[in-house]
């Protein structure tokens, strides 16, 4: 597998896990390209393979170990990084021949391991790498990671043990990166972190200069800066703190997408206390209602856990009641499963697996009814949409209410007829709906074509 002298060194790359891990992969890939490495889409063509792992839940650990094994069998020279890398003994027990193991966002260790296995070229490709770096997303949207780590200690979560406490990026650094992405053709910025609403608390909200004015390293100020770029900006992983209200005027004024991704997790005060989560359910409902009053177009997405240890029938019913009262637009849920290292594992009264699955099915059926009615109410409206895909004569897009991969789609029936392209912004008249998606026809006079180009690499 050793490269011939003067041949371009080739690296295979596998990226697993959440959008935050995807950003880590993009940063590593950017550095590899800057140093002259080719990124190849197969194990056979690679001189070495980097696997960026996930370790959040047991199924993710299994997927990561399987990916390492596949790379070992097909290539034999494997470098492991990412969240599962915080458990090197588990990786080396399964695969003692891996070349190196490092934890998340440890970019230097990854590069050192690559250098040791495969020295870089003397004539790197600096001029061939866009100033916004290598992106693994389609060219019209990008994840913008604003911080690492988390100060919360939720009992079901082990992220702080893997990624550490909150470390915010300076606001000017984030805004400059966003500006580079927009210059490269990105039309949607997806702000991600472990806790977006806590952004800047570790830096004591320090002020930094950008575009001839000072900005605090704080969520609201960051959003104000991003709104200057003239693209869609979507907030993910927001905690339901009171100061979230501060960004609602930006949404109401059209400067920020009217969208909040807030993981409520449950509606029982006792269960929330066991989870070590904020537990004032009445205040949460009041806050959701206030957001809708301040910005009637707002979309609220959330995630929940059913079958948490000790969850009673009555507490599960209270969760269903919460859905009825909150009328959330988008909801994700999963049945609780123990995570190695989580303090919730020690809680008494585990819920039987069959009960968890029955509750999950009821929960999702309840939310499907709510989502279907909320989508049906959009029939006859005009929604601005961003085209993600062209399939035959139909353009598959997302409205301002839909984040990529986790929310619904808008199927534009006359997309082919109008010659729509991926990355186009278009107004769509909604003609039909189901419990997940919308259907409609584009208004031809209101198409903003995609411009610019970002280098898009496919993951192995």
UniProtKB/Swiss-Prot annotation:
It is found in: Cytoplasm. Its main location: cytoplasm. Keywords: 4Fe-4S, Cytoplasm, Iron, Iron-sulfur, Metal-binding, S-adenosyl-L-methionine, Transferase. SMART domains: Elp3. [4Fe-4S] cluster 1 binds at residues 18, 54, 83. One of its GO terms (biological process) is tRNA modification. It catalyses: L-aspartate(89)-[ribosomal protein uS12]-hydrogen + (sulfur carrier)-SH + AH2 + 2 S-adenosyl-L-methionine = 3-methylsulfanyl-L-aspartate(89)-[ribosomal protein uS12]-hydrogen + (sulfur carrier)-H + 5'-deoxyadenosine + L-methionine + A + S-adenosyl-L-homocysteine + 2 H(+). Residues 136-374 form the Radical SAM core domain. The keyword Oxidoreductase does not apply. Belongs to the methylthiotransferase family. RimO subfamily. Catalyzes the methylthiolation of an aspartic acid residue of ribosomal protein uS12. This is Ribosomal protein uS12 methylthiotransferase RimO. It comes from Xanthomonas oryzae pv. oryzae (strain PXO99A). The gene is rimO.
